Design a protein with these regions (language model features):
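RNase H-like, Mg2+-dependent phosphodiesterase core
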Residues: 3-316
Length: 316
């Protein structure tokens, strides 16, 4: 996920891109009179002169109908389009037998959820511990229920070293004024990897694997002037959890922390805060705005999401 992540799929009357929450919010703010009720699992639908635009919770945005190219050019979204040739050039690769290396992996959870913190975890899995974690059933957190995550993670923490960082909504909103989402994630991933590297010294991983959310050159540009882990041993790949179990373990630890954070905020402020960014989220946000105001909403939610503007309209 680059701040504006590139993805593909283009046909004569259809185009799918991946946009950041900021991009979706900008489209909604620019075309308020064209907003329609979004379908299930989506956060925004616009109908503009024969063109239908649907933004989904996953970050995917589907453009259907007439005038796609004109709209893309008008809104300066050309850089998001990617030909299959460019895609093949950009596809990263890992060394042979990487999945059996001793690796430190990192992953984040919460960047697509309106309520709750952004959590980043790093986990170190030595080659000796790989069979044990596989036997335990460690896998990508998205493939597990919340209950399974909460049952699994304490056991994982007993077996491997890890580092967990949590960026709570109030601080997130403050930082988001000067840094984009991917810059925040880069700083957190780097810090989680560095702190865990110090924790396991003198042992050192054979490789570092970051669940890729932007191109490596952009990642390092965000970290200019920051101390880094060994760049020569650092790899980036999407769906990192399928390439090494260290990323899967980090994903589970980060997911558990996100769920705990959501529960903690729910208890503190007296609302059952849902995950995701769907219509149920809009309803709770509108209630908070109506009864408690923006000062409380900023403590529990990521305000730059399109949900904030929707909640404001619902409150009225």
């Amino acid at each position: 996920m680059v701040f504006l992540k590139r993805t593909r799929r283009i046909t004569m009357n259809s185009l799918t891109l991946t946009l950041s929450p900021e991009q979706v919010s900008a489209l909604e703010a620019k075309y308020p009179s064209y907003v329609e009720s979004p379908p299930p699992h989506s956060v925004l639908r616009l109908k503009i002169d024969g063109l239908t635009i649907t933004a989904y919770q996953s970050g995917k945005v589907l453009f259907q109908g007439k005038g796609i190219e004109t709209f893309i050019q008008k809104n300066q979204l050309e850089s998001l389009m990617e030909t299959s040739e460019e895609k093949s050039k950009d596809t990263p690769s890992l060394p042979k037998d990487f999945s059996s290396w001793s690796v430190m992996g990192s992953d984040e959870v919460g960047n697509g959820a309106y309520f709750g913190p952004l959590t980043v975890a790093s986990a170190y899995v030595s080659k000796e511990n790989i069979p044990l974690l596989k036997k335990m059933g460690v896998k990508d957190s998205k493939d597990l229920t919340d209950e399974q995550i909460r049952a699994f993670v304490p056991k994982i923490k007993e077996v491997i070293p890890y580092k967990l960082l949590t960026l709570w909504p109030e601080k997130y909103n403050e930082v988001q004024q000067v840094k984009n989402l991917n810059e925040m994630k880069a700083l957190l991933h780097n810090q989680a990897l560095r702190l865990l590297s110090e924790k396991i010294m003198p042992e050192s991983p054979e490789g570092y694997l970051i669940d890729q959310f932007c191109k490596p050159e952009l990642y390092y540009r965000y970290l200019k002037g920051q101390p880094l882990v060994d760049k020569n041993k650092t790899y980036f790949i999407t769906k990192g959890e399928s390439h090494h179990i260290a990323v899967a373990a980090a994903s589970m630890i980060a997911r558990c922390a996100f769920l705990d954070g959501l529960d903690s905020l729910s208890t503190e402020f007296g609302y059952k805060l849902p995950s995701g960014a769907g219509s149920n989220v809009d309803q709770i946000a509108a209630k908070i705005l109506k009864h408690n105001g923006m000062n409380i909403l900023r403590k529990v939610a990521k305000l730059h999401f399109a949900n904030t503007e929707k909640a404001k309209r619902m409150k009225e």
